[in-house]
From Swiss-Prot:
Sequence segments annotated as region (Disordered): 1-80, 114-182
Gene: prkrip1
Biased composition (Acidic residues): 164-173
Organism lineage: Eukaryota, Metazoa, Chordata, Craniata, Vertebrata
A single cellular component GO annotation: spliceosomal complex
The name this protein goes by in its record: PRKR-interacting protein 1 homolog
GO biological process: mRNA processing; RNA splicing
Keyword Aminoacyl-tRNA synthetase in annotation: no
Organism the protein comes from: Danio rerio (Zebrafish)
Length: 182
C-alpha cells in the first residue's frame, strides 16, 4: 500500500508529521526519551560512542638547535617560547609518572589476585583432604562392621549346626501341648 502525498507532486518528498517538542527536565526523563526514540525503530542500529582516546603528551623534540634559558629578558619572545617548552616538558613528566604509578598499581592488583586465588585453592585442597579422610574413615568403619557381622553370622551358623544336633534330640520328645488351640 503506497503512502499518498498531500501535495500530489511526484518529485516532492514526504514530510514527517511534526511531533510535540518535549524538553527533559531530569536526566532520568532524558534517558527515557532517548530509549523511546531508539525503540521506535528496533531494526536501526543504536549509536554506541567509542571510548575516547587517552591523552598523550607530544613527544619531546629529538634535537634542539638553540637551547634558550630562563635568563631571557622580560618581554622578549624567547622567554615565552622557553616557558611553553618548560610547561610541555612538565606535563610530559607528570604523564609518565601517572602512567608508571598506574602500571605499578595494576601489577600489585594482579599479584594480589594470584595470591588470593592460590590461598583459595590451598583452603579448598585442605578441605578436600579432610573430606576424603572422613570418607575413608566411614568406609573403614563400614567394612569393619560388615566383617564383624560376617563373623557373627559364621559363629551363629557354626553354633546353629551344633545346636541342630541338640534339637534333633529335642525333636524326639513329644510336645505336651498343642499351640494355637484353646
Amino acid at each position: 500500500m503506497a503512502v499518498e502525498n498531500k501535495d500530489a507532486r511526484p518529485g516532492k518528498a514526504l514530510k514527517k508529521e511534526s511531533q510535540p517538542l518535549i524538553i527533559a527536565k531530569t536526566p532520568a526523563e532524558e534517558q527515557r526519551l532517548k530509549l523511546e526514540r531508539l525503540m521506535r525503530n528496533p531494526d536501526k542500529a543504536a549509536p554506541i560512542p567509542e571510548k575516547p582516546k587517552e591523552w598523550n603528551p607530544r613527544a619531546p623534540p629529538e634535537f634542539v638547535r638553540d637551547v634558550m634559558g630562563s635568563s631571557a629578558g622580560a618581554g622578549s619572545g624567547e622567554f615565552h617560547v622557553y616557558r611553553h617548552l618548560r610547561r610541555r616538558e612538565y606535563q610530559r613528566q607528570d604523564f609518565l609518572e601517572r602512567l608508571s604509578e598506574k602500571q605499578k598499581l595494576d601489577e600489585e592488583y594482579k599479584e594480589k589476585l594470584i595470591e588470593n586465588q592460590k590461598a583459595a585453592e590451598d583452603r579448598t585442597a585442605k578441605r578436600r583432604k579432610k573430606r576424603e579422610k572422613l570418607k575413608q574413615k566411614k568406609l573403614m568403619a563400614k567394612k569393619a562392621k560388615m566383617e564383624s557381622q560376617k563373623e557373627e553370622d559364621s559363629e551363629k551358623s557354626s553354633s546353629s549346626s551344633a545346636s541342630e544336633g541338640e534339637e534333633k534330640d529335642d525333636d524326639a520328645e513329644v510336645p505336651s501341648f498343642i499351640m494355637g488351640k484353646r
